[in-house]
């Protein structure tokens, strides 16, 4: 029996009540509904607040008090605050406050602003110079006997710290702010410089000073170029005048015959800033400076210490005559004298030392001025463990000349070493008085009148 195809298609249409179009529309609607549910209940879901119905009132009161504190108002205890900062989502800080010791402080290192948190155990925090807070019950006798510490009594009600929200909102009505006090720490100018420049004297590593070596080399190159501009005539004339200004009678005129400024440069390294204390002018640290006896010095100053190494050939050659057995009585009438020609050449071969450079103030008490005179001093000296290697060459006589006499060489070497120690080796120092950039006030009327009278007397005497 054969069933017609029309009957089969009609039966299939009666069994399937949905067509392709109806299925497509139903699928799209289901996808849209699913997306809407996800967006509403998952992504844009409102946070459920664990607080009770009266929390909104407490939060509004807390915000009003925060605005009052931020504008520079006063809290219930009469303590002026500078600002409050909160963060509602800081769970880690809440846990840290819950597990921390009572009365602990939150402070920022390297700043003069200190944060105070009131203690819940009734302890009175004590502020030291480093900004840390210590409960009075745990400070001990050392804190009680210190006169530089600052004790701030605070109530025992718990408050909030920076970014920490308390669990109980009922305490926000009175005490709910952290107090930021601007403490003017009594720091010396040297300590303040170190604090603001973040330089730790104990932990800072020495510096190489490569850039400074290049700068010094350029300066030395310019000095050598200026000296050789006129065949060293200007330099030779200056040295001749310096040598012949003060010389004994048995030495004839000194003539500079050779000068060599070298072709190498000093190398500075291992520079470090130290904190060096100095005493009054009469102590050993200030001896040999040709300073006034009534000068005083600061208790402490910064000092730059660095190693210097110079390997070069800096040569100075002179010639003169030694006048021997010259009779003083017959010298106006007869020129009976015996002279011995001497030629010397001194060369600096190697110099290594530890260089100290410091900048401090000298306070000089004057009778004319009511105020003391302050001068800025730049001092330079070397430590005693220096090494100065010299090469001395000599030539004595006119006809039968003696070359490189050991006795004369050792004598010249010892004299130069002694002169260097007496002028530039610690405790002696080479000082430079730096000029003031700002004009100083005129002296008192008495001093001005005395100066005018002195000038008038001088003018009358010259006329």
UniProtKB/Swiss-Prot annotation:
Subunit annotation: Homodimer. Component of the ER-mitochondria encounter structure (ERMES) or MDM complex, composed of MMM1, MDM10, MDM12 and MDM34. A MMM1 homodimer associates with one molecule of MDM12 on each side in a pairwise head-to-tail manner, and the SMP-LTD domains of MMM1 and MDM12 generate a continuous hydrophobic tunnel for phospholipid trafficking.
Residue ranges that the UniProt entry lists as topological domain Lumenal: 1-23
Segments in the Cytoplasmic topological domain: 45-463
GO BP terms: aminophospholipid transport; intermembrane lipid transfer; mitochondrial genome maintenance; mitochondrion-endoplasmic reticulum membrane tethering; protein insertion into mitochondrial outer membrane
Comment block on domains: The SMP-LTD domain is a barrel-like domain that can bind various types of glycerophospholipids in its interior and mediate their transfer between two adjacent bilayers.
PANTHER family per UniProt: TEX2 PROTEIN-RELATED
Subcellular locations according to the entry: Endoplasmic reticulum membrane
Source organism (scientific name): Yarrowia lipolytica (strain CLIB 122 / E 150) (Yeast)
Domain (SMP-LTD) ranges: 205-435
Membrane topology: Single-pass type I membrane protein
Taxonomy of the source species: Eukaryota, Fungi, Dikarya, Ascomycota, Saccharomycotina
Any Pfam family matching the protein: MMM1
Residue ranges with Polar residues bias: 108-122
Protein name: Maintenance of mitochondrial morphology protein 1-2
Protein family according to the UniProt entry: Belongs to the MMM1 family.
Alphabetically ordered keywords of this record: Endoplasmic reticulum, Lipid transport, Lipid-binding, Membrane, Transmembrane, Transmembrane helix, Transport
GO cellular component annotations of the record: endoplasmic reticulum; endoplasmic reticulum membrane; ERMES complex
One annotated GO molecular function: lipid binding
Annotated region described as Disordered, given as residue ranges: 72-152
Function, in words: Component of the ERMES/MDM complex, which serves as a molecular tether to connect the endoplasmic reticulum (ER) and mitochondria. Components of this complex are involved in the control of mitochondrial shape and protein biogenesis, and function in nonvesicular lipid trafficking between the ER and mitochondria. The MDM12-MMM1 subcomplex functions in the major beta-barrel assembly pathway that is responsible for biogenesis of all outer membrane beta-barrel proteins, and acts in a late step after the SAM complex.
Transmembrane parts of this sequence: 24-44
């Amino acid at each position: 029996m054969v069933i017609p195809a029309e009957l089969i298609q009609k039966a299939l249409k009666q069994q399937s009540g949905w067509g392709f179009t109806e299925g497509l529309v139903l699928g799209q609607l289901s996808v849209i509904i699913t997306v809407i549910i996800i967006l509403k209940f998952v992504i844009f879901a409102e946070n459920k607040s664990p607080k009770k119905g009266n929390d909104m009132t407490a939060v509004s009161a807390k915000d009003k008090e925060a605005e009052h504190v931020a504008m520079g108002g006063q809290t219930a205890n009469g303590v002026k605050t500078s600002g409050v900062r909160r963060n509602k989502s800081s769970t880690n800080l809440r846990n840290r406050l819950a597990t921390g010791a009572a009365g602990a402080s939150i402070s920022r290192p390297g700043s003069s602003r200190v944060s105070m948190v009131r203690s819940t155990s009734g302890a009175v925090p004590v502020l030291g110079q480093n900004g840390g807070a210590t409960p009075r019950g745990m400070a001990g006798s050392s804190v009680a006997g210190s006169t530089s510490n600052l004790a701030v009594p605070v109530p025992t009600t718990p408050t909030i710290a920076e970014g920490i929200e308390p669990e109980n909102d009922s305490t926000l009505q009175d005490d709910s702010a952290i107090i930021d006090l601007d403490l003017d720490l009594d720091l010396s100018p040297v300590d303040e410089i170190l604090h603001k420049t973040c330089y730790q004297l104990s932990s800072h590593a020495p510096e190489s000073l490569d850039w400074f070596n290049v700068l010094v080399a350029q300066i030395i190159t310019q000095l050598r170029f200026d000296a050789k501009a006129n065949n060293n005539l200007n330099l030779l004339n200056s040295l001749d005048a310096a040598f012949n200004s003060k010389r004994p009678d048995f030495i004839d005129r000194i003539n500079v015959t050779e000068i060599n400024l070298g072709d190498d440069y000093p190398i500075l390294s291992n520079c470090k800033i130290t904190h060096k204390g100095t005493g009054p002018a009469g102590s050993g640290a200030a001896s040999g400076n040709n300073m006034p006896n009534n000068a005083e010095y600061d208790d402490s100053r910064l000092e730059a210490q660095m190693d210097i190494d110079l390997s070069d050939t800096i040569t100075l050659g002179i010639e003169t005559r030694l006048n021997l057995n010259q009779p003083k009585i017959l010298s106006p009438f007869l020129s009976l004298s015996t002279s011995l020609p001497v030629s010397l050449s001194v060369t600096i071969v190697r110099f290594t030392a530890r260089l100290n450079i410091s900048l401090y103030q000298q306070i000089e008490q004057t009778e004319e001025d009511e105020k003391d005179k302050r001068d800025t001093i730049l001092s330079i000296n070397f430590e005693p463990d220096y090494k100065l290697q010299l090469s001395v060459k000599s030539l004595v006589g006119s006809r039968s000349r003696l070359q490189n006499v050991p006795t004369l060489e050792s004598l010249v070497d010892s004299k130069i070493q002694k002169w260097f120690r007496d002028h530039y080796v610690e405790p002696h120092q080479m000082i430079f008085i730096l000029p003031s950039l700002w004009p100083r006030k005129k002296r008192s009327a008495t001093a001005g009148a005395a100066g005018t009278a002195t000038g008038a007397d001088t003018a009358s005497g010259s006329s």
